[in-house]
Each structure stands twice: as C-alpha cells, then as structure tokens.
Amino acid sequence: MAEYKNYTLNFGPVHPAAHGVLRLILELDGETVVRADPHVGLLHRGTEKLAEFKPYNQSIGYMDRLDYVSMMCNEHAYVMAIEKLLELEVPERAQYIRVMFAEMTRILNHLLWVAACGIDLGAMTVFLYAFRVREDLFDCYEAVSGARMHAAYFRPGGVARDLPTQMPQYKQTRFTSKRKTKKINANRQGSMLDFLDSFVVDFDKSLDEIDTLLTDNRLWKQRTVDIGVVTAERAVELGFTGPMLRGSGVAWDLRKSQPYEVYDKLDFDIPVGANGDCYDRYLVRMAEMRESNKLIKQCVDWLRANQGPVLSDNHKVAPPKRNAMKNNMEELIHHFKLFSEGYCTPEGEVYVGTEHPKGEFGVYIKSDGANKPYRLKMKAPGFTHISAMDELLSGHMLADTPAIISTIDVVFGDVDR
C-alpha cells in the first residue's frame, strides 16, 4: 500500500481562530506546515463600486464597515482624500478632535487584538480585562455620534458636532445597587474632556494588568517567541506596514514620516521590535497603546484650552445649522440638496494614506468633475499582510497557526471590501 506523507487540511472559513472568513488550505507533513494557500473574497461586498454610485458624502457610512473594529480610522482617510480633492481647510479644533478619536480607535483595535489573541492561545482572562476598558471608549463614540461602532462622525471639512458637555451615565437597575451605580458614574459627572482626563490615568493601570498577565508569562512566551519571524529587510520587501513592519525593527510610521492633521505638533514615540516574531508584534502593540494614551492626553489639554469651530464654513460641503434649517426655507433647501445630491469636485486624482491601527490605510479617488467618484480604490493593510501567509506559516507546527494569524491582526471587512 502506498504511504501518504503529506496531507491537506482546510483551516476555516468558520474556524474561531480564522479571525473572520479566512480559508487556509494547509499542506502538512505530520504536524508541520509545508505550504499555506490563503483564499480570500468570502466577505466581498463591492464597497468600492457602491461608493462610485453614491455622492461623496453618502459613502462615509461604508467606510465604517470596512475594518469594522477601527471605524473612525477608515473614515479619516476617506474624508481627508475628499478634502485634498477640494483643497478644503479643516479647523484646528476639528483636527485635534479627529486625532483624539483616531487614537481612541487605535486603542479599541489593539485591545480587541490582544483579547482575541489571548483566547486563541488559551489566555481567557485578558479578554475580560480588555473588554471592560473598551466599554468606556465606546461610550465616547456614542456620546458624539449616537452609535457605539459605526459612527460616521468624521465629515469633509471637520467633524459632525463638537464634544458633548455631559457624558452618558449608567442607570440603576435591579442588578446594581445605588452605591455601585454612583461609583461607576463618578467620572461621568462632567464633560467628555473630564471623563477622558480620568480615563488616561486609569488606562495605564489597565495596561499594567494586561502586562502582568502576559508579558513575562512563560506559556505566553513559549507560544510567541521565535514564531512567525520576519526580518526587517524581508518585511520591507513584502510591503508590510504598521505593527507588522515595526515589529521587525523598522521605525516607519506615517504620523511621523508624513505627518497629517496635527501629529507634527504632538509628542510621541514609535515603538519598534527587535526580532520580528509574534512576541515582538505583541510588545509593539502594547507600547502603541501607551503612546496613544499620551496623544489623547495632549489632545484633551489642547481642546480644553482652545475653543473654535469644528466644521468648515464652506457651505458647499457643510450643512446649515439645525436651528436655522428649522426656521428658514433657504437653509432647509440647502440641507436637502446637500444630502441628496452632494457636491461636485474638481477633475483630478488624489491618494491619502493614514496610519491605521493595522498599517497604512489608503484611499485613492479619481474624479471626473461629477458629484461621485469616477474611481475609488482603497489600500487595505490586511490584504498585503495576508499575502505573506505562506512564508509566515511554512516550517511551523500546526498549533502555531492561530498565533501567527492572530498577530497579523487581520479583519476581512477591509481585506475583501
């Protein structure tokens, strides 16, 4: 009888460690991965083509649903591309608000990443710790937009509205005592800026808890050290960006190398790894959360000291004030025309790249002068990273596959688009 040495295994698309709908066809020699063939496209929704049939301002909601755990960072690149096309000035206060929410989104993304990675590798407790913190940031999303995830808060020319002067509070239920309700509402008595002042102090302590659980944990290091190694030279050749690139020791960050918004006015460092393995990518993301926390604090201090408009006064892209719209027919017509027909942009093409939590997220728009893009193309960091799956997995044990997939931090909303 013939002896079969290699065999093929389907990993996903419904495997809990596939992080979405990834289908991997693994060729195994015993328990060693010989070849990995990633199949993508199972979450394709035609976002780029949909946006080409909508006015520019009606596609912001689509951006939230690309990488659906880094919502406002997707919006950020899209509205900046429209602003570049229109040569539109954004008020400074709006820029600080955008940067603050972009860094909140980075923390949201990395907390979900460390929680999911922990579960993949058998560390359940970190999931509970991370989600406890994420709730506070989702409350900030809800306070400015009314939605806890798909906010559509960034607009061409600024943001939809200024920061609220009152944070939402928990209500007492039959499951919580009056004393406990008062305790959890203690930091919600003032404005959002007051709440964030309290958050940045508490968040450092929360990161210390996760550090204690994982960083020097012997089992965690056994599952991540020297697993999925990518050298700095190879990471550049493969087109890696974000933590995947910085984990290999390359200090490339668009917020520093090609500053946008007000990042050139803020003080922060770029964490880098040394060995390019799963453990280094974990350390980089943990350090990035601390840097994002510092950036949020700097934005809060500036916003507290400086008032001003949060949306451009260019009436071509900015809707009228709501109270004016309810009292004057001209403003009502303006509002209706703006949100039904949108606005035309000059002919031309632009590309804007931002430092997304997963890497460089880019938006390319080609305009023919109409009120909708002639062509919209998005550069998703996850697509580039997942293209290197064969190289990352080959030679490793089957049990290392979830660790490597997890540290890539892939979400198929933006990979498949």
From Swiss-Prot:
Q: Which HAMAP family match?
A: NDH1_NuoD
Q: What does this protein do?
A: NDH-1 shuttles electrons from NADH, via FMN and iron-sulfur (Fe-S) centers, to quinones in the respiratory chain. The immediate electron acceptor for the enzyme in this species is believed to be ubiquinone. Couples the redox reaction to proton translocation (for every two electrons transferred, four hydrogen ions are translocated across the cytoplasmic membrane), and thus conserves the redox energy in a proton gradient.
Q: Which GO terms describe its cellular component?
A: plasma membrane
| Subcellular location, principal | membrane
The EC designation for this entry is 7.1.1.-
Per its record, the protein catalyses: a quinone + NADH + 5 H(+)(in) = a quinol + NAD(+) + 4 H(+)(out)
Pfam families to which the protein is assigned, alphabetical: Complex1_49kDa
Species of the source: Francisella philomiragia subsp. philomiragia (strain ATCC 25017 / CCUG 19701 / FSC 153 / O#319-036)
Gene3D superfamilies the record matches: Cytochrome-c3 Hydrogenase, chain B
Compartment(s) of residence: Cell inner membrane
Record text on subunit structure and interactions: NDH-1 is composed of 14 different subunits. Subunits NuoB, C, D, E, F, and G constitute the peripheral sector of the complex.
Entries under NCBIfam families matching the protein: NuoD (TIGR01962), PRK06075.1 (NF004739)
In its UniProt entry, what is this protein called? NADH-quinone oxidoreductase subunit D
